[in-house]
Amino acid sequence: MNDLCTDIGYRSLNHDGEQLCGDHIDIVEQDDDSIVVVLADGLGSGVKASILSTLTSKIISTMMAAGMKIEDCVSTIAATLPVCSVRGVAYSTFTILRFVQNREAEIIQYDNPHVILLRDGQNYEYPRTVMNIDGKEIYSSRITLRENDIFIAMSDGCIHAGVGMKLNFGWERKDIINFMEPFANVGFTAKTLDTILLDECNKLYDGHPGDDTTACVVRIRRREPMNLLIGPPSNPDDCSKMMSLFFSKEGKHIVCGGTTSSIAAEFLHKPLVPTVDYPDPEIPPIARIEGVDLVTEGVITINKVLKYAQDYLADNESYTQWSYKKDGASQIARLLFEEATDINFYVGRAVNPAHQNPNLPINFNIKMRLVDELSTCLKQMGKRIKVSYF
């Protein structure tokens, strides 16, 4: 076992005028350090394509979750998928990325654009072996992983972007490589890299995609622990225990809440220094405690972080806000979304008397709900989450 992990981001653009996407992505965790990503592209667009791509990805991911070999999965799906009598091609193509113990990647590709691998900021031509299964050419590759490797899987909507419009022959694979290479060493998350790629595809389509367009980016990175403390414990006698556990953990430490930060400052025997800067008038200012990486207000700030997290999982349109702003919510978002891989929440159950004012839209249940919903969003981002209550 090593300290590498996978950071995964994906997004789709629907064919112009269609409610459903004809591409589908399934992600299956086999264990803590092995994961399978399946991208399927159904023939055509609309409902039929959506059903066929979903069927393809579900069959492959389900078989792999059951422990079957990749060759068996490929053989089954290749033999199962029919070939269109008119077009002479399979009803659904697929790309499989399997990361084993965060040490090796297995790539299986059938009729989708070949996966791009960026290594050390440049395109890396990995070896491919051709398998012939039931008359279908399947490309297979095995690659030893390195930190900062970036895999880009895509449907043919990406390489068709701009065809007959801004580009005569579409956005070819080599063009996508040239476009993405400058972003490889910047440190962007997989989701951000994926958003950059899909936004460019959408521009080439002039906002009216002529095909379902999907990209999935997987970035290999080292694990980074993060710790967030919010709320004092329900039993005041547990303050020392809660603080000892929190500050003993490896990684950066975030303290949220006025009372909580006062307790943390007392525990560390350091002064709590408030700031008067309001980078965002909607978010209370941060404070500073020596030995703590970030000190913020509680419920209002976390509520904003939750909104950013929900948007991040959707279209990531708020990225341009939280990626550079200096308010507490934006700083927490950068730490949790971009830096952290393993996040420990320490949640105090004490009731804040100030929140019991019936004229305020804040109460104890809202604080618990915010933590639960934020934890769920972070899990969907692929983070390992542990929540401890006091």
What are the roles of these predicted feature ranges?
Residues H24-T80, I152, G164-I176:
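Primarily the active-site beta-strand->alpha-helix module of PP2C/PPM metal-dependent phosphatases
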Residues R103-E104, S248-H253:
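Short active-site oxyanion
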